[in-house]
From Swiss-Prot:
A Pfam family hit: dCMP_cyt_deam_1
Protein's recorded name: Riboflavin biosynthesis protein RibD
Cofactor note: Binds 1 zinc ion.
Function: Converts 2,5-diamino-6-(ribosylamino)-4(3h)-pyrimidinone 5'-phosphate into 5-amino-6-(ribosylamino)-2,4(1h,3h)-pyrimidinedione 5'-phosphate.
Deaminase: annotated span: 1-152
CC cofactor: Zn(2+)
Highest taxon in the source lineage: Bacteria
SUPFAM superfamilies attached to this UniProt entry: Cytidine deaminase-like, Dihydrofolate reductase-like
Length: 339
């Protein structure tokens, strides 16, 4: 990201969104916020993203990098600056003390304790503008965090790989690999920014997955998600999911909402279980997003990506809408959200 000057507030917010994505997965339990500081001539004088827990928020990181050039400048940030004391002082204090001229943000802070920053800034004489690229931010880097704030439960993304005829394995049960290497690398990148990976005991017993996030060279990513195994069956002590490469939690239930309550301290959960677990979560309305890696192969046979979802006729079909479609190597990645 070597942009030195912007021509519009929207362009500056686009850069702030990039900074937000850059820190996603490293800021838990704080939201992954990005900030850019622009002087009156459109020159970027400071930028940054939220630091890990205990570190500074994005606005303060950007102010630190801007130094005295922040005076009279425009601060563009993906979320309303906070107005409370936590492990760090309120961001509004730093903005007022830096004598910035204007603060532009995308989405309001829904936290009743931390919110109210916009009003505080206005009262101090700063110009404040809200809602810039709000939909892009809310559906992008802050999607999972905002869901957690609204519901108190983690955001669940069901990820699966399938052939173009909807099969998750061949008739003999083999599935390595349906998706391409490029798709698998993309998945590992997503694992590295998730808080937890969720599978059932059936997947562990059948496939013995490690459920780790890895880099392109095969080494472990610096940050590993919590591995969560759901079900009442025992798994062998030598199972790879129990190795010391990451932490593992066992949740002995078949009820999706019990699982989510047990993970209520998490924000972003990847459901990678097989058709039984996926079906249970879909029936419970516990999936917020679907990521389907579709490979250009035909398998036929009985092994579908999902079991019964409680639909007996076409009228009662579970209807989703496409969020995005992109090419990942030879595969397609379909992203869908609930209507």
């Amino acid at each position: 990201m070597n942009v030195e000057q912007v021509k519009s507030i929207d362009e500056a917010m686009g850069l702030a969104i990039e900074h937000s994505y850059q820190v996603k997965g490293t800021t838990y339990p704080k939201p992954p916020v990005g900030a850019v500081i622009v002087d009156p001539n459109g020159r970027i004088v400071g930028a940054g993203g939220t630091e890990p827990a205990g570190g500074d928020h994005a606005e303060v990181v950007a102010l630190r990098r801007a130094g005295g050039l922040a005076a009279g400048a425009i601060v563009v940030v993906t979320m309303e600056p906070c107005n409370h004391y936590g492990k760090t002082p309120p961001c509004v204090n730093a903005l007022i003390e830096a004598r910035v001229g204007t603060v532009v943000y995308a989405v309001a802070d829904p936290n009743g304790i931390a919110g109210g920053g916009a009003g505080r800034l206005s009262a101090a004489g700063l110009q404040v503008r809200s809602g810039v690229l709000a939909e892009q931010v809310a559906a992008g880097p802050l999607r999972e965090w905002l869901h957690k704030q609204r519901t108190g439960l983690p955001h669940v993304t069901w990820k699966y790989a399938t052939s173009i005829d909807g099969r998750s394995a061949a008739a003999d049960g083999s599935s390595q690999w349906i998706s391409s290497e490029a798709a698998r690398l993309d998945l590992h990148r997503r694992r590295a920014i998730a808080d937890a990976i969720l599978v059932g005991t059936g997947t562990v017993l059948a496939d013995d997955p490690a459920l780790t996030a890895r880099l392109a060279d095969g080494s472990l990513a610096p940050q590993q998600p919590l591995r969560v195994v759901v079900g009442k069956r025992d798994i062998p002590p030598e199972a790879r999911v129990l190795n010391d490469e990451a932490r593992t939690m066992m949740i002995r239930t078949h009820e999706p909402m019990e699982v989510l309550r047990a993970l209520s301290d998490r924000t972003d959960v990847l459901l990678e279980g097989g058709p039984t677990l996926a079906g249970a979560f879909l029936r419970a309305g516990a999936i917020n997003r679907i990521l389907a890696y579709v490979a250009p192969i035909l398998l036929g046979g009985p092994v579908t990506a999902v079991d019964d979802v409680g639909v007996s006729n076409i009228t009662n079909a579970l209807r989703w809408q496409f969020d995005s479609v992109e090419k990942v190597g030879p595969d397609l990645l379909l992203s869908l959200v609930a209507r």
